[in-house]
Amino acid sequence: MVQAKSKGFQAGVKDYRLTYYTPDYTPKDTDLLACFRVTPQPGVPPEEAGAAVAAESSTGTWTTVWTDNLTDLDRYKGRCYDIEPVPNEDNQFFCFVAYPLDLFEEGSVTNILTSIVGNVFGFKALRGLRLEDIRFPVALIKTFQGPPHGITVERDKLNKYGRPLLGCTIKPKLGLSAKNYGRAVYECLRGGLDFTKDDENINSQPFMRWRDRFLFVQEAIVKSQAETNEVKGHYLNVTAPTCEQMMQRAEFAAEIKTPIIMHDYLTGGFTANTTLAKFCRDKGLLLHIHRAMHAVIDRQKNHGIHFRVLAKCLRLSGGDHLHSGTVVGKLEGERGITMGFVDLMREDYVEEDRARGIFFTQDYASLPGVMPVASGGIHVWHMPALVEIFGDDSCLQFGGGTLGHPWGNAPGATANRVALEACIQARNEGRSLAREGNDVIREACRWSPELAAACELWKEIKFEFEAMDTL
């Protein structure tokens, strides 16, 4: 009897699409799904480009290797299961890729991003590659702690309901001594704000070391709380050169009983952020997250990572607040797209909605929500639009719009608080802030000289530029 010869190892190079393009595949509930905007080089078919993305972000490499025979590639490979042309774009495609759950370490955003947005983004066969959206399976989400506390617990801690929270970034962002910094914090909190904030640039520079800042700020918080009978807070930035120093600062903040700390999650990194989020839950600290560096990653349409993905990743990694743009201020943000990722930050379940850039239905499986923070070039005339756009579960941050008041910091804070309370009352009475917002502010000016002065100062300040991030 003659035995058939085994095919054995077949060395060589073959097209990615022969293995990784599987249009008949139906994604499983346990698959992690990703949507990439792919711009192939001229002459590269979209099927080959999509398959290359699936291969290079999972099990593939440029040539067949002998060790492929030592595992079950069909079990572990990524699969490009659908390709759609991008509307109104030439030679650009949405490629949908499914990744098996076993490719990712439990509870690690770092590992997920290392795989999905790793070396493939430098692939020569592609002119551009952007990760537009991602669907985390419930089985993977349940391995994450998520936000230290979430929106509901934060409101209970603050005893503040039925309105957005009000904040302010202390300016100038660099150069103040710790004592003068604490003075500005006190004036803003006494004037009516709920929070003040370290700028993302503030860490521990020669003009103001972190420990001095923490102590003067905490003194300001305690004094303003005693005078106003309201819970107050300041986002103390614990971002540091090393994780050990970051945790040292966080532990000191917990010792002095400050209510909330802050982290720059993209420059600090997801490993550091997840570590900090777990610490904050254990210690009862709220965690404010700044997105410094995000525009380097997400602003270009054809290459990078969309902010909705970065926001989803932050919700898994952990944070109670996250900056999300303003729509109406000085920073980039188109309304529909912004509200799409705001919903992804704070809702339990979000349906697919292509009009808002949401490519997948996302179930967060009871993971706490993240409060969006609107900050950047906003002032009292923007208040009606901000309340109408973001609703109650948000934090509105006025930096220059508080500290730039002609009468000083405390009157600037009072002007913003009066404008907010007037908008909430008008909304609750059934008035439309979209149509009557300016009238609501003008009426409030009659009984608030602080607001009247702010309105006069900023009556002609607008930031009207076309958003780059559009569908």
Curated annotation (Swiss-Prot):
PTM annotation, UniProt: The disulfide bond which can form in the large chain dimeric partners within the hexadecamer appears to be associated with oxidative stress and protein turnover.
Matching PROSITE patterns: RUBISCO_LARGE
Principal location class: other
Chain's role: RuBisCO catalyzes two reactions: the carboxylation of D-ribulose 1,5-bisphosphate, the primary event in carbon dioxide fixation, as well as the oxidative fragmentation of the pentose substrate in the photorespiration process. Both reactions occur simultaneously and in competition at the same active site.
Miscellaneous comment as given in the Swiss-Prot or TrEMBL entry: The basic functional RuBisCO is composed of a large chain homodimer in a 'head-to-tail' conformation. In form I RuBisCO this homodimer is arranged in a barrel-like tetramer with the small subunits forming a tetrameric 'cap' on each end of the 'barrel'.
InterPro entries: RuBisCO, RuBisCo_large_chain_AS, RuBisCO_lsu_C, RuBisCO_lsu_C_sf, RuBisCO_lsu_fd_N, RuBisCO_lsu_N_sf, RuBisCO_lsuI
The keyword Glycoprotein belongs to this UniProt entry's keyword annotation: no
CDD domains to which the protein is assigned, alphabetical: RuBisCO_large_I
Subcellular location(s) of the protein: Carboxysome
Sequence positions that bind Mg(2+): 197, 199-200
N6-carboxylysine: residues bearing it: 197
Cofactor, how bound (note): Binds 1 Mg(2+) ion per subunit.
Gene Ontology biological process terms, A to Z: photorespiration; reductive pentose-phosphate cycle
NCBIfam families: PRK04208.1
Name of the protein in its database record: Ribulose bisphosphate carboxylase large chain
Family assignment from sequence similarity: Belongs to the RuBisCO large chain family. Type I subfamily.
Species for this entry: Microcystis aeruginosa (strain NIES-843 / IAM M-2473)
Site location (Transition state stabilizer): 330
Active site positions, chain numbering: 171, 290
EC number of this enzyme: 4.1.1.39
GO CC annotation terms, alphabetical: carboxysome
Cofactor(s) this protein cannot do without: Mg(2+)
One of the record's GO molecular function terms: monooxygenase activity
Subunit structure as annotated in this protein's UniProt entry: Heterohexadecamer of 8 large chains and 8 small chains; disulfide-linked. The disulfide link is formed within the large subunit homodimers.
Ligand binding (substrate): 119, 169, 173, 291, 323, 375
